[in-house]
């Protein structure tokens, strides 16, 4: 299914947005085909009816498949910027006169030699970049409010790309403002003390989700935000054309894409998010044309592969949840390539107990120890491990 645009809602408490549509468990699919639930209802009605029920009419919509096609990255997402603002404090989408879409927030960072923690209340999906390099995300769905940042130099550029998702439209959470809600701050340990910086002097740029803005971005020679924008590929606007000899309803498969919106021949087809479970967008045949057709995709995360196709059945139950590579499920191997060790060094030669002392406090859910020989770098085994606190207690 799809809501043909942006008006999906979200459940609360917590934040559980509908990616692109509500599922009310109806008796018919979008293409008017009867569901299993319809046939069960019909069987129940027939059981208590004294007359034979009329025959099920044939579905009026014809389903077609569209061959796999590759889209080209035509323009950076920043080319969709149509309005900019500057403020001492970050401002919301609503203060920028925008109900949905994405916003770019930019400010400068202080020098922090040890790395820091970014504290942020972002509605709804925030991606962080330092000098154009992606450093992480803050996802409201997971109730995330912090992000670990690497060491920074004075004047390093922090860019936050914030996308609005479904709105809570009931209860105490009905005032569901989008964007950065409140102050954004950094905390870090400096000489044993926790120091806090509240980030000020923000520059904002709005990117509306509309077909006209997409066309503008595809043809824009440069961004209105100029040198302030530094969003890397593969985030951006993608486009392709394809030809059809016959039209009919179809389901566009978006499972290789990241997160964003699809336009078909000028119509807002719906939103997508790779995590699913819905991986297809229903496309009514009346929006397709014999001859040349156009698809524009706005992806605020970037695709795994910029391909899509039309199929004659929906894919509504395929989860592709983001998984952490640092966990201790049986049979799993943590990925520590990008992790900064708390302690490293060589143990004494020989068997027996060895003591490893952390030079600073460390907090986490799991302890991972990577051991290898000094001769050829191959892994070695550890028989027992005991963790002790600063008082020597296990």
Language-model regions, residue ranges each:
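Carbohydrate-binding surfaces of carbohydrate-active enzymes
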Residues: 1-227, 284, 300-303, 321-335, ...
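Short strand-edge motifs at loop-to-beta-strand transitions and within beta-strands
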Residues: 105-107, 143-147, 238-240, 277-281, ...
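Aromatic-lined ligand-binding clefts that engage carbohydrates, nucleic acids, or primary amines
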Residues: 115-129, 158-160, 242-265, 272-273, ...
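Extracellular beta-strand elements of beta-rich domains used
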Residues: 128, 184, 242, 385-387
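A glycine-anchored, Pro-Gly-centered beta-turn/N-cap motif
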Residues: 154-156, 248, 289-291
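Edge beta-strands of jelly-roll/beta-sandwich modules across compartments, strongly enriched
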Residues: 164-175, 303-312, 353, 376-389
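Aromatic, loop-rich ligand-recognition surfaces of beta-strand-rich domains
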Residues: 269, 332-340, 347-394
